[in-house]
């Protein structure tokens, strides 16, 4: 991790902790009024709007974008990268494992994610890949202000 990324993650962890303590009930109430309580029984995922606006700029294909959104749904803790199985992503997306692998390879080749392999003996990850999103976070932080400026012109 770069020092800048650690700072961003530390700041976002601090801000999310402070804001979640202060407004967790308010934001949950807002989400429930928007989506309904039942729709949120499996939780919810926060995704920066910049990612949607930058999909075309970054040339992320629809399949790779879907894979990325599914990875984000598994990113629960700031310092713990998502590690879903490719098979579970394929089932959720109703595509083949190979299609998921192509989407992951695209994101990796673009430099947005870094795949880290684990051993089958690892007590937690059990051979699943860990998907490091550092580059995605840095890209969004670098590109979002520019896209916002362009949109407001």
Where are these regions (language model features)?
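Short recognition helix of helix-turn-helix/winged-helix DNA-binding domains
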Residues: 1-99, 106, 126
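Short coil/turn motifs at helix boundaries and re-entrant loops, enriched in small/polar
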Residues: 14, 152-153
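Winged-helix/helix-turn-helix nucleic-acid-interaction surface
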Residues: 25, 96-151
């Amino acid at each position: 991790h770069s020092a800048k990324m650690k700072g961003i993650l530390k700041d976002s962890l601090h801000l999310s902790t402070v804001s979640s303590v202060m407004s967790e009930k308010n934001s949950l109430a807002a989400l429930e009024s928007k989506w309904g309580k039942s729709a949120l029984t499996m939780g919810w995922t926060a995704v920066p709007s910049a990612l949607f606006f930058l999909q075309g700029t970054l040339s992320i294909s629809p399949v790779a974008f879907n894979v990325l959104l599914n990875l984000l749904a598994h990113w629960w803790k700031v310092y713990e990268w998502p590690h879903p199985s490719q098979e579970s992503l394929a089932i959720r997306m109703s595509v083949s494992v190979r299609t998921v692998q192509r989407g992951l390879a695209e994101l990796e080749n673009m430099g947005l994610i870094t795949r880290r392999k684990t051993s089958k003996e690892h007590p937690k990850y059990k051979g699943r890949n860990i998907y490091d999103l550092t580059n995605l976070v840095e890209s969004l932080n670098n590109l979002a202000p520019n896209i916002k400026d362009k949109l407001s012109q």
